[in-house]
Amino acid sequence: MTVLQAIVLGLVQGVGEFLPISSSAHLILTPWFFRWPDPGLTFDVALHLGTLIAVVAYFWRDIIELVLSGLGQPRSQDGRLFWYLIVASIPGAIFGVLFEKQAETIFRSPLLIALTLTLMGLGLWWADRVGRKRRQLDDVNLFDGIIVGISQALAIIPGVSRSGITMTAGLLTGMERETAARFSFLMSVPIIAGAALLKLKELPLHEVNLAFIAGVLTAAVVGFLAIKFLLQYLRRGSYLLFTGYRILLAALIVAVFWLRR
C-alpha cells in the first residue's frame, strides 16, 4: 500500500466514522472501486485508532469530567451517564469478539454492503421522521444505554454504520438529533479503543511504516473536522441527506458489480 492510498483511506475513515454512512463499508469499497489491494481488517482498526484520537481531542473535557464523576460520584448526573456509556459498549464488544471471522470474510461482500447501506439509510430516515427529538444528554437513562448499546452490536456488518445505527436508536428513544450524535460519539471511545488495542497488539512492528502512520494521522484530522461539521449541521439540518447518499452509493455498487461480471 502506498502513502497516497493510505491517506485516501484515512480521509475515508475520518469522514465515514462520524457521519452515518459506514466507515467500514467505505474502507472495503474504496480499494474495490480502484482495484487496490485490500488493506485488511487490521489496517481498518488502525485507522479507527486515528478516529479515536479525533473524538478524544474533540470531547476531552467531557471525557475527563465523565470519568472523574463516574469513579468519584457515580450517583451524579455525569456519573450515571458515564456508566450508561459503559453499559452501552458491552453488546458491541461481545459481538465483535464472537463474529470477528465473519467480519473479515463474508461481511465484506459488496452486494451485502449495498443492501445494508440501503436498509439502514431508510431506517435512519424513518427514525428521524418519527422520533420525538425532545430529550437532551441530561435526560439519557439506563434504558437508553441498553437500547443504543444493543443496536451498536449490529455495526460489525459493513454498511450498517456504528454512528448511523446508534443515532437511529437514539432518535427512536426520543433524543434530539444533536444529542443522539453526541451520545453516539462518546460511546465510540471505549468500543474503538478496545477494538484497536486487541488488533494492534497482533500487528508486527515491521508493518508500521510511513503509509500506516499517514493513514492514522489523516483519519484523526479529518475525523475531528467531521465531528465539528455534523454537530453544527444537525442543529438545523436532518438526516435525510445521509439517507440519500447511502441509497445512491448502494445503486453505484450494484452497477459496478454488474458491469464487472
From Swiss-Prot:
GO terms for molecular function: undecaprenyl-diphosphatase activity. InterPro entries: UppP. It comes from the Bacteria. It is an enzyme of class 3 (hydrolase). Pfam families: BacA (PF02673). Keywords: Antibiotic resistance, Cell membrane, Cell shape, Cell wall biogenesis/degradation, Hydrolase, Membrane, Peptidoglycan synthesis, Transmembrane, Transmembrane helix. The keyword Protein biosynthesis does not apply. It is found in: Cell membrane. The keyword Disulfide bond does not apply. The chain crosses the membrane at residues 1-21, 40-60, 79-99, 106-126, 140-160, 185-205, 210-230, 239-259. Its EC number is 3.6.1.27. Coiled coil: none annotated. One of its GO terms (cellular component) is plasma membrane. It is a multi-pass membrane protein. It catalyses: di-trans,octa-cis-undecaprenyl diphosphate + H2O = di-trans,octa-cis-undecaprenyl phosphate + phosphate + H(+). One of its GO terms (biological process) is regulation of cell shape. Bacitracin is thought to be involved in the inhibition of peptidoglycan synthesis by sequestering undecaprenyl diphosphate, thereby reducing the pool of lipid carrier available. Catalyzes the dephosphorylation of undecaprenyl diphosphate (UPP). Confers resistance to bacitracin. Belongs to the UppP family. PANTHER family: UNDECAPRENYL-DIPHOSPHATASE. This is Undecaprenyl-diphosphatase. The gene is uppP.
